Amino acid sequence: MPAMDLLNYCIIVRCGPDQESQALSALEFTQALLVQGHKVERVFFYQQGVLTASSLRTPAQGELNITKLWQQLQIENKLVLDVCIAAALHNGIVDKTESERYELGAHNLASGFQLAGLGQLAGATNACDRVVTFGASQ
């Protein structure tokens, strides 16, 4: 049996953390790729997916903390977790730089995540063998 070709993937997460089954599918798919030896160029959180990157998220008792699961995966695999800056700002998610820029006095981008523009997504999709999107457009 021939060896499996290892591919370079870009994952786009458009579903919010409250859409637990879709959000968990994105995480588990990414985990499976890494276990199989594939490379994940980056994970790009877009539209409602940016809500995953809020350090202020506190899921209800019994719900998964998808933010912490992504953070753990990022640490273990040195993943790039990009968050669309326009969608993040629209949803009140800012890093220290944007907080200072807009004189907000606080920031809430969870550790392990970074703000990025659509240019990073475009570059990643050109560099990847496969692009997989989770979540319906809103």
Segments (PLM) and residue ranges:
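Short, charged beta->alpha transition segments
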Residues: 1-2, 69-72, 117-122
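Histidine-anchored nucleotide/phosphate-binding helix
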Residues: 22-43
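Short, glycine-rich nucleotide/cofactor-binding loops
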Residues: 10-24, 53-58
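Short, active-site-adjacent cap segments at secondary-structure transitions
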Residues: 50-53, 89-91
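Short internal beta-strands
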Residues: 30, 41-47, 81-87
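Protein-protein interaction regions
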Residues: 6-7
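A glycine-rich helix N-cap at a beta->alpha junction
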Residues: 59-90
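N-terminal glycine-rich phosphate/adenylate-binding segment common to multiple enzyme folds
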Residues: 85-138
